[in-house]
Amino acid sequence: MNWIQLAQEVIEGKRISENEALAILNSPDDELLLLLQGAFTIRQTYYGKKVKLNMIMNAKSGFCPENCGYCSQSSISKAPIDAYPMVNKETILEGAKRAHELNVGTYCIVASGRGPTNRDIDHVTEAVREIKDTYGLKICACLGILKPEQAEQLKAAGVDRYNHNVNTSARHHDQITTSHTYEDRVNTVEVVKHSGISPCSGVIVGMKETKEDVVDMAFQLRELDADSIPVNFLHAIDGTPLQGVHELTPIYCLKVLSLFRYVCPTKEIRISGGREVNLKSLQPLGLYAANSIFIGDYLTTAGQEETADHQILKDLGFEVESVEEMKASLQGQ
């Protein structure tokens, strides 16, 4: 397939088919640079050489009643993690200060559990208002399954974006968790959209799914019209049901990122958890398809040093998108 021609057709408005998407994942490895060139042509059309930086605050860790097979915080995990209840407001504000110092545009407040209590919502919204007043950061919340009235409260407090991943395909979902349904996840994204908050929803690749499942994930997110799509690559943690699963190669991960760029050309594609251990030395190439990364640590696993990420961007000739630019792009969605 002519990847450069396909990319140009995407820029002109073509929505690629499932067969074309599957061809991306099945493409010969020696076509990788051509595939990435096409993905970069699309990425550059909509985002230039700007990169959005995101940072996570793990505001509540562990104690989750759900049985997600990939997660070290789940009820079935035996992984030794640092579990704690919701942190105080001062800790959340300290994280925001650190994000501001590192020129991060989006600060992500994440809490474990099936969904937030009303008390959790009150606590988070109080912190969000202070962060907005003090640092002006864009705020993404990730608190679990959300009720409409909770979404409205978050919106009123100034939350810009809400993350709730579909994680995998509808077909593969019950192989990963049975404590909630795929529809529960999709419904939360719809609740977020209805409230006026920008929806963020993504995937975890490498959980024994098929290539067809990965294509289904991308098309589901295209249908959901998620503004931001975090693409995680499984970091198999000892003590979880998926421990020891290492199916991914750096080249396949790059094909996955390219797939999401071709299927969702105008969306923020973020290289998320597991990028260091799965992309390895090919991490920089991922940004030819994606336009966003997390810096710093993840929820229960360590990321690489922030200085290393900034060096990657400098070496690529890319620029960090400023907070002001991120606000402007959000208002345009």
UniProtKB/Swiss-Prot annotation:
Key words, A-Z: 2Fe-2S, 4Fe-4S, Biotin biosynthesis, Iron, Iron-sulfur, Metal-binding, S-adenosyl-L-methionine, Transferase
Binding residues for [4Fe-4S] cluster: 64, 68, 71
PROSITE patterns: RADICAL_SAM (PS51918)
Residues that, per the record, bind [2Fe-2S] cluster: 108, 140, 200, 270
Domain Radical SAM core: 46-275
Cofactor(s) recorded in Swiss-Prot or TrEMBL: [4Fe-4S] cluster; [2Fe-2S] cluster
Source organism, top-level taxon: Bacteria
Enzyme Commission code: 2.8.1.6
Catalytic activity from the UniProt record: (4R,5S)-dethiobiotin + (sulfur carrier)-SH + 2 reduced [2Fe-2S]-[ferredoxin] + 2 S-adenosyl-L-methionine = (sulfur carrier)-H + biotin + 2 5'-deoxyadenosine + 2 L-methionine + 2 oxidized [2Fe-2S]-[ferredoxin]
GO molecular function: 2 iron, 2 sulfur cluster binding; 4 iron, 4 sulfur cluster binding; biotin synthase activity; iron ion binding
SMART domains: BATS, Elp3
UniProt keyword Transferase present: yes
Gene3D superfamilies found in the cross-reference section: Aldolase class I
Involved pathway(s): Cofactor biosynthesis; biotin biosynthesis; biotin from 7,8-diaminononanoate: step 2/2
GO biological process, one term: biotin biosynthetic process
Note accompanying the cofactor annotation: Binds 1 [4Fe-4S] cluster. The cluster is coordinated with 3 cysteines and an exchangeable S-adenosyl-L-methionine. Binds 1 [2Fe-2S] cluster. The cluster is coordinated with 3 cysteines and 1 arginine.
Subunit structure: Homodimer.
Function: Catalyzes the conversion of dethiobiotin (DTB) to biotin by the insertion of a sulfur atom into dethiobiotin via a radical-based mechanism.
Protein family (similarity comment): Belongs to the radical SAM superfamily. Biotin synthase family.
PANTHER family: BIOTIN SYNTHASE (PTHR22976), BIOTIN SYNTHASE, MITOCHONDRIAL (PTHR22976:SF2)
Name of the molecule in the record: Biotin synthase
Protein species of origin: Halalkalibacterium halodurans (strain ATCC BAA-125 / DSM 18197 / FERM 7344 / JCM 9153 / C-125)
